[in-house]
Amino acid sequence: KNLDFENESVRKCIRIIGPRTNTWDSAKVGIASPPIKTKYGWLLLYHGVSKSHNTYRVGAVLLDLKDPAIVLARSTDPIFEPEMDYEKHGFINNVVFPCGMVVRKGLVYIYYGGADKVVGVATMKLDIILKALRSGISR
């Protein structure tokens, strides 16, 4: 198979989320992992940083199954933030920076970098994340 992408181009870019005013993700946001399909929508994790301090935290977004450019819900508070010493102290302090997630038997495994020094894995129950998002957490 030919893997030459020389003549390919991005056809359309759509902004899905951005920083929010006066929140934990007010300075910048970025994707943390590919979205995972659930019965309620695509679950997407992202990292965010506030303007008041340089702490990297993790939020969740639920996207429409048929049109993943539509945000159905977004976590008001971070679902994961630096707590352990190895997340708070390292090359860059106060960082949890997810790069992937896997769902297995109802548990979400979030693989992340901690303080740019270690690689870790955190777990959360999928139904708890989805319930929180579906219960009206702000967009």
Model features per residue range: what roles?
Residues 94:
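Short, flexible loop/turn motifs enriched in small residues
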